[in-house]
Structures are given as structure tokens and as C-alpha cells.
């Protein structure tokens, strides 16, 4: 039986837009939770997983906005993989993700949270083919920051917000 999970989606049927629509957890959600708990020794709650995924999406979006500017500076009308500000740390996390992605089993979850940020330029095929790896690398980067910056096995909401601030400063 799938559990209900609140992703903060506002129901269009309600006139009161402060009401939140509850939806089923996306596939891969439980696998991410299991992997973080058993392999990374990080115990996340539904709330902290939601904060984690929102932070990953925010970092992904920030990468794209900077890449759009670099593409313009380079005289291109599309964003290429080379335009992304892939730091050495993120590159290492992407490589680690590629080694363990089968063990994590989060492909469906990454597809669910993957999105093209609202940029004005087209996205090159080389970059589109790397979405999953970049998102997976960002997940592992967040896990690394959780362990090193907070030292908490079960991070609180405040700890997750702190982690999001640290990752945000990287990009």
C-alpha cells in the first residue's frame, strides 16, 4: 500500500489556495529513503525528504540559470553541458552516483523531480542526457553536506534548511 505524501501541490479545485492537495508518493521515494538509511546512515522523515528534494531542484535550477548566462556570453543560442558550473565536488558526486545508481534504485524518482527550469534558451542534447546523473550527484552532495555539516543521523527541519543554504552558496 502506498503512503500519502504532501508535495505542496495546490489543488486547482479549491478556491482557497492555501489548501494543499495530498498525492501518492512517487515511485522511488521509498528506495531513496531506504538507501539513505541503510547505506548513508541518514534517517529522513517525509518532511526532510521533501526539503531534500526541493533543495536538489533549487540547486539544479540555479545551475541552469548560470548556464544560460554563460551560453549567451559564448554566443550560443542553446545551453550545453559545458555551460553548467559543475564544481569539482559535484563532479565527484556525479561519478559516485554513476557507480551506485543501480543500488540506489531511484531512477523513477529522479525522472519525477527532473525538470527543465524556465530558461529562455533551448537545452542541448548533451545536457539533456545528463539530467539524471546531475540530479543524482546533487542528491549525494546533499547527503555529504548533511553528514559533514550537521553530523546528525536524523536531521531536523532546521538542519535541512542549513544544508540547503550551504549547497546554495556553492552554486
From Swiss-Prot:
Gene3D superfamilies documented for this protein: Histone, subunit A
Organism this protein belongs to: Aquifex aeolicus (strain VF5)
One Pfam family in the UniProt entry: DUF1931
Transmembrane spans: none
Family: To A.aeolicus aq_616.
Name the UniProt record assigns to this protein: Uncharacterized protein aq_328
InterPro entries linked to this entry: DUF1931, Histone-fold
Disulphide linkage map: none
Amino acid at each position: 500500500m502506498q503512503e500519502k505524501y504532501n508535495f505542496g501541490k495546490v489543488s486547482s479545485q479549491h478556491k482557497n489556495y492555501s489548501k494543499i492537495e495530498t498525492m501518492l508518493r512517487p515511485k522511488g521515494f521509498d528506495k531513496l529513503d531506504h538507501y539513505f538509511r541503510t547505506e548513508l546512515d541518514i534517517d529522513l522523515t517525509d518532511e526532510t525528504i521533501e526539503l531534500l528534494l526541493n533543495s536538489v531542484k533549487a540547486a539544479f535550477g540555479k545551475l541552469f540559470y548560470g548556464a544560460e548566462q554563460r551560453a549567451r556570453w559564448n554566443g550560443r543560442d542553446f545551453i550545453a553541458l559545458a555551460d553548467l558550473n559543475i564544481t569539482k565536488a559535484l563532479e565527484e558526486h556525479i561519478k559516485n552516483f554513476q557507480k551506485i545508481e543501480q543500488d540506489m534504485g531511484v531512477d523513477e524518482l529522479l525522472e519525477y523531480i527532473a525538470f527543465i527550469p524556465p530558461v529562455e534558451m533551448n537545452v542541448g542534447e548533451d545536457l539533456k542526457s545528463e539530467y539524471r546523473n546531475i540530479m543524482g550527484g546533487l542528491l549525494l552532495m546533499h547527503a555529504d553536506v548533511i553528514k559533514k555539516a550537521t553530523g546528525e543521523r536524523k536531521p531536523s527541519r532546521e538542519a535541512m534548511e542549513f544544508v540547503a543554504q550551504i549547497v546554495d552558496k556553492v552554486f
